[in-house]
A protein has these predicted regions:
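Active-site beta->alpha N-cap acidic-glycine motif
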Residues: 1-34, 83
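Acidic-and-aromatic substrate-binding clefts and catalytic sites of carbohydrate-active enzymes
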Residues: 10-22, 41-48, 69-76, 96-101
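Short low-complexity, flexible loop/linker segments enriched in glycine and/or proline
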Residues: 25-28, 51-53, 82, 103-107
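Histidine-centered catalytic micro-motifs
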Residues: 35-41
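An active-site-proximal "capping" alpha-helix that borders the catalytic cofactor pocket
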Residues: 48-59
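Active-site-adjacent pocket scaffolds in enzyme catalytic domains
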Residues: 58-59, 63-161
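Short, solvent-exposed beta-strand-terminating loops
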Residues: 163-170
């Protein structure tokens, strides 16, 4: 589907998954897509995993790994992300999700923090309605499209994310 529409994407992969699905990761890379880090494991995180996952993905792909996204879009220590060698972090969802996080005080669009480019997930202007996978699956398609286009026109880009399991029948 991406190739048909000439769309390039970033695939944030845990190193553990990549090491168990090497051929898939290399096929994604051959399609011209970026491979970025989603940590070593999705279920647990240690600061050492920042560097460890980056190195494992770089060894597998033979390419630099520049991006990081924390599992569950939880906050990370920017200084540690920078020290591990990442150029950008896409872990911020600049909205309020009760019981999860409140990032209403953070910028809605890209910004620099502690030497790392921050690429937040897109949220609508004004009310900061999150336009991530959950909205995509639960809003009427026409409404999601209108909100996404409004955000794209306002911000000059649109950044959303999906998980591989969303494209399979479970």
């Amino acid at each position: 589907c991406l190739a048909r529409h000439r769309v390039k994407a970033t695939f944030f992969c845990t190193a553990n998954f990549a090491l168990h699905a090497k051929d898939l990761i290399l096929d994604i890379q051959k399609g011209g897509h970026e491979i970025a880090s989603h940590g070593f494991y999705h279920s647990s995180f240690e600061t050492a995993d920042l560097r460890k996952s980056k190195e494992a993905l770089e060894e597998l792909t033979g390419q630099p790994v520049n991006g990081f996204r924390m599992a569950r879009m939880m906050p990370g220590e920017e200084e540690e992300i920078h020290k591990a060698g990442y150029l950008y972090n896409s872990s911020l969802n600049p909205t309020c999700i009760p019981g999860r996080y409140n990032h209403l005080g953070q910028p809605r669009t890209y910004f620099m923090k502690d030497g790392v480019l921050q690429l937040p997930a897109s949220v609508t202007p004004i009310v900061r309605f999150p336009l991530f996978w959950l909205a995509y699956h639960n809003l009427p398609a026409s409404l999601y499209r209108k909100l996404a286009l409004w955000t794209w026109k306002e911000d000059g880009y649109f950044l959303t994310y999906f998980h591989p399991w969303e494209f399979t029948s479970l």
